[in-house]
């Protein structure tokens, strides 16, 4: 792998809040050594996009890895000089004086293999053919992502993270870290996540994938060669997903049964505000996301089940962990309900592992983990204060 320089944020040419990490620049890490995948195949000569915030201390003990969810990326915080509107997806959590304080911690965001934001994925050129991988890109798993992230840590000379943190799918990666590399993280922070998908969640993913696969513009996953994108399928997939990210309470408050116009029109066009919102979200998503990536990531979600190798016994699976845990859930999250977080907490307690648990009564459903709720952020701030005290940050 090429040498890694620890980047510093570029000077801002525009006004930013004092608690912003500022203008940031991603870096591309190239790995020549093949990465063995869980499916038995391997991928060589791959790239991972990485962003960092804060300063790695001399002991390299203050690093925190932030793992991203389905449609996010390495761009966790800050803005890009070429597009100051492109704010990091967890910017309210990461920055100077924020819960994950970059004055004390060195924060790393990694874009996972198979994504469409610069890391090697279906849109990348397959060296064997000179054309985009497309449908030929190998199916990847949460464990594969974690193994690749461990190589990023090696490149920075980080032998142990102060914490590995993630929400939703990112939380699954944090759990996988605690199992695959138990000695390489002091703390595991799991937010709005689950130890495995329920049958209902797998079903949602299947319906979303079916929308993409049945789009005439999908072309078996090789739509790049045809100069098209399966936008209709991707739009429907996003609409389905977005419904599951919001609570009934939140949707009622935002939209209720408000009409888009003054009166009903007795048509099958958009009549209600909630329909307009979902179509807008679907159209926006279809413009920037890749359909093959959506298929890969939702399948990785489906496959994650650390208890499977232990006959379905999560307590036995979690016996491998050494980290201290913070697990947080949200009362109105029906995608990954609090009961799923409590399963994880029980398995940890059964193993006498140190774990703190909080269930936050927020009205915003699954997406609450991305929002600036004072109770949620105070919880995270207090926990990171504890970590900082432990490591002398």
From Swiss-Prot:
InterPro entries reported in the protein's UniProt record: AB_hydrolase_1, AB_hydrolase_fold, HAT_MetX-like
Disulfide bridge map: none
Enzymatic reactions: L-homoserine + succinyl-CoA = O-succinyl-L-homoserine + CoA
Record GO biological process: homoserine metabolic process; methionine biosynthetic process
GO molecular function: homoserine O-acetyltransferase activity; homoserine O-succinyltransferase activity
Keywords, ordered alphabetically: Acyltransferase, Amino-acid biosynthesis, Cytoplasm, Methionine biosynthesis, Transferase
CC terms in the record's Gene Ontology section: cytoplasm
Pfam family, one: Abhydrolase_1
Record's keyword annotation contains Amino-acid biosynthesis: yes
Occurrences of domain AB hydrolase-1 (ranges): 62-372
Active-site residues annotated for this sequence: 168 (nucleophile), 333, 366
EC number per UniProt: 2.3.1.46
Main localization of the protein described in the UniProt heading: cytoplasm
Binding site for substrate: 238, 367
Localization (cell): Cytoplasm
Keyword Transferase appears in the UniProt entry: yes
Signal peptide: none
Domain of life: Bacteria
Pathway per the UniProt entry: Amino-acid biosynthesis; L-methionine biosynthesis via de novo pathway; O-succinyl-L-homoserine from L-homoserine: step 1/1
Positions bearing the site annotation: Important for acyl-CoA specificity: 335
Subunit structure: Homodimer.
HAMAP family for the chain: MetX_acyltransf
Family: Belongs to the AB hydrolase superfamily. MetX family.
Function description: Transfers a succinyl group from succinyl-CoA to L-homoserine, forming succinyl-L-homoserine.
Name recorded for this polypeptide: Homoserine O-succinyltransferase
Organism lineage: Bacteria, Pseudomonadati, Pseudomonadota, Betaproteobacteria, Burkholderiales
């Amino acid at each position: 792998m090429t040498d890694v320089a620890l980047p510093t944020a570029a000077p801002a040419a525009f006004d930013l809040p004092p608690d912003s990490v500022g203008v940031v620049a991603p870096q591309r890490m190239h790995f020549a050594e093949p990465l063995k995948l869980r499916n038995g195949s391997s991928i060589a000569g791959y790239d991972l996009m990485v962003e960092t915030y804060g300063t790695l201390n001399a002991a390299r003990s203050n690093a925190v890895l932030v793992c991203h969810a389905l449609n996010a990326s390495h761009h966790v915080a800050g803005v890009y000089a070429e597009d100051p509107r492109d704010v990091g997806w967890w910017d309210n959590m990461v920055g100077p004086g924020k819960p994950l304080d970059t004055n004390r911690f060195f924060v790393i965001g990694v874009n996972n293999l198979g994504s469409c934001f610069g890391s090697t994925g279906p849109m990348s050129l397959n060296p064997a053919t000179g054309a985009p991988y497309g449908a030929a890109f190998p199916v990847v798993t949460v464990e594969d992502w974690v193994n690749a992230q461990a190589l990023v840590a090696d490149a920075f000379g980080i032998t142990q993270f102060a914490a590995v943190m993630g929400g939703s799918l990112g939380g699954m990666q944090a759990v996988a870290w605690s199992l695959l590399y138990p000695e390489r993280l002091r703390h595991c922070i799991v937010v709005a996540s689950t130890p495995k998908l329920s049958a209902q969640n797998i079903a949602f993913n299947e319906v979303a994938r079916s929308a993409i696969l049945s789009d005439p513009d999908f072309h078996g996953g090789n739509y790049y060669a045809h100069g098209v994108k399966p936008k209709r399928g991707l739009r429907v997939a996003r609409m389905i997903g977005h419904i599951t990210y919001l609570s009934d309470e939140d949707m009622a408050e935002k939209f209720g049964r408000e009409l888009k116009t003054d009166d009903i029109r007795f048509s099958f066009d958009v009549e209600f505000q909630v329909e307009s919102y979902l179509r807008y979200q679907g159209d926006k998503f279809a413009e920037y996301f890749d359909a093959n990536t959506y298929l890969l990531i939702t399948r990785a979600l489906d496959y994650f089940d650390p208890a499977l190798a232990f006959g379905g016994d999560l307590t036995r699976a979690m016996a491998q962990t050494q980290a201290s845990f913070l697990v947080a859930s949200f009362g109105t999250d029906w995608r990954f309900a609090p009961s799923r977080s409590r399963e994880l907490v029980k398995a940890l307690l059964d193993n006498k592992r140190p774990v703190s648990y909080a269930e936050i009564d927020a009205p915003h459903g699954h997406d609450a983990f991305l929002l600036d709720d004072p109770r949620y952020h105070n919880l995270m701030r207090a926990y990171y204060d504890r970590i900082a005290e432990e490591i002398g940050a």
